[in-house]
Amino acid sequence: MIALIQRVTRADVRVGGRTTGEIGAGLLALVCAERGDTEAAADKLLAKLLGYRVFSDAAGKMNLPVSNIDGEGRAGGLLLVSQFTLAADTNSGLRPSFTPAAPPDEGARLFDYFVAAARARHPIVETGEFGADMQVSLVNDGPVTFWLQVRP
């Protein structure tokens, strides 16, 4: 499973002109299930995402997770957006292959599982809509962007 995470000062996702998810300071995570991924992989990726220390502490070092973005216990937002293109095979030719991505029904099931698990563990979780044509707006803080990937 893959998550491309970006530290943001704000982010939102819109579908068909309506906002489906919006956060202030926190993390925007573009999330992709790959063929063979399991709930265990989703749990492992979520634990990494929630614990990843990308927010600055008082000394200015990236040392704080999304659950404590200011060093005083304030949780940041988490905006989860499904994006199967993260699994693209770009090794040959000029057109990406999406064979490595989980089939749509399995991808939807794992994304829903990931979102439910995130909501059980973090107070501020917003989402896009799986499989929809979405418009994502963000202000990347830093910029700070990381590729997280776990194998089943």
Swiss-Prot record:
Alphabetical keyword list: Cytoplasm, Hydrolase, RNA-binding, tRNA-binding
CDD domains to which the protein is assigned, alphabetical: Dtyr_deacylase
UniProt GO BP: D-amino acid catabolic process
Reactions catalysed according to its record: glycyl-tRNA(Ala) + H2O = tRNA(Ala) + glycine + H(+); a D-aminoacyl-tRNA + H2O = a tRNA + a D-alpha-amino acid + H(+)
A GO molecular-function annotation: Gly-tRNA(Ala) deacylase activity
Alphabetical list of Gene3D superfamilies matching this protein: D-tyrosyl-tRNA(Tyr) deacylase (3.50.80.10)
Motif (Gly-cisPro motif, important for rejection of L-amino acids): 142-143
Subcellular location: Cytoplasm
Domain of life (superkingdom): Bacteria
GO CC, any one term: cytoplasm
Comment on protein domains: A Gly-cisPro motif from one monomer fits into the active site of the other monomer to allow specific chiral rejection of L-amino acids.
Family statement: Belongs to the DTD family.
Subunit composition and interactions: Homodimer.
Protein name as annotated: D-aminoacyl-tRNA deacylase
Annotated source species: Burkholderia cenocepacia (strain HI2424)
Lineage: Bacteria, Pseudomonadati, Pseudomonadota, Betaproteobacteria, Burkholderiales
